[in-house]
Amino acid sequence: MHKKPTVLGAQNALQVLSTVVQETPLQYNKRLSDALSASIFLKREDQQQVRSFKIRGAFNKINALDPKELEKGIVCASAGNHAQGFAFSCNQLKTAGHCQLSPL
């Protein structure tokens, strides 16, 4: 069962992630703005070290695990972007990780 998000949890995640996640810009997109008659900005998460926002969830979760949970290593299954965030997080946190990539 998942825990309901809290303000304190978000504040803790912000503090933890500030050590590994880069602040990325919003970029105005004229073509989409014109097509949709609205001001459209794209959040450039492709500028993260792993080229995706997936680092946020992977790092925050692995960092929150108890050291006993990490002793045997951790496992994930992914089709791509999450695997990059997972591998980066395991490396940064010096934790053994095994990732099963799904075939395309």
Q: Where are the regions a protein language model picked out?
A:
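PLP-dependent amino-acid enzyme catalytic core
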Residues: 1-104
